[in-house]
């Protein structure tokens, strides 16, 4: 969705010491901390800003079980990629570009108009986003501090119907950038059975404080699968 609103929300419950956590047996109100980053946002009662996931036990399979699942139902597709499984499936960045214009993705414009979340399909994405194209054979992209980008994964991935998945940070030590703003993948994402071709993951990316250089094929996150 090229009209991503770049809206950061966190769940708060009474008596808790962490964001986005609700203790077992909790009964009471829930609150949302809402922080628009790039665009000014208009919200109304009933707008959906967060997704709640309920977990019981440890639904994440081991790496061995994930490799076995990949053998039976491919999780990663593409002749130039293979399943990098270590604490989840490694997700790398595609900076080769697609189409005749070698499109890499989009960067959010500054000082754009207000976004009314109730007006679905109303806005022209070009009013909020500028395209980024590959230049020559460098296959690198310099992230400007605190700019917001939409890029895609090099891998085409699948989530079987009896699984869900979440994109988590690869390693905080590799740099001050974040790629998992839109981190949840629903059951059946990119899935069409054994013969499926998968779908590229859309990555919402921001660098913090300092410029950061991304290179084509650099691992930026891991897709952690959870059995339903």
Predicted regions and their residues:
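DUTPase catalytic domain/fold
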Residues: 1-228
């Amino acid at each position: 969705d090229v009209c991503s609103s770049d809206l950061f929300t966190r769940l708060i419950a009474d008596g808790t010491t962490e964001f986005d956590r609700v203790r077992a047996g909790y009964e009471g109100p829930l609150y949302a901390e809402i922080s628009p980053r790039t665009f000014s946002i208009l919200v109304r009662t009933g707008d959906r800003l967060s997704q709640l996931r309920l977990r019981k036990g440890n639904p994440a399979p081991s790496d061995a079980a994930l490799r076995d699942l990949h053998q039976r139902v491919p999780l990663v597709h593409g002749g130039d990629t293979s399943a990098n499984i270590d604490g989840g499936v490694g997700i790398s960045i595609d900076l080769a570009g697609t189409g005749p214009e070698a499109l890499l993705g989009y960067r959010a414009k500054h000082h754009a108009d207000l976004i009314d979340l109730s007006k679905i399909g109303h806005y022209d994405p070009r009013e909020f986003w500028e395209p980024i194209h590959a230049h020559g054979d460098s296959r690198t992209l310099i992230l400007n501090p605190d700019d917001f980008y939409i890029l895609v994964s090099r891998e085409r991935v699948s989530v079987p119907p009896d699984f869900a998945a979440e994109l988590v940070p690869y390693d905080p030590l590799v740099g001050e950038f974040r790629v998992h703003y839109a981190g949840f993948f629903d059951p059946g994402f990119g899935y069409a059975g054994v013969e499926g071709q998968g779908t590229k993951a859309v990555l919402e990316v921001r660098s913090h404080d300092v410029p950061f250089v991304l290179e084509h094929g650099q691992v930026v996150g891991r897709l952690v699968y959870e059995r339903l």
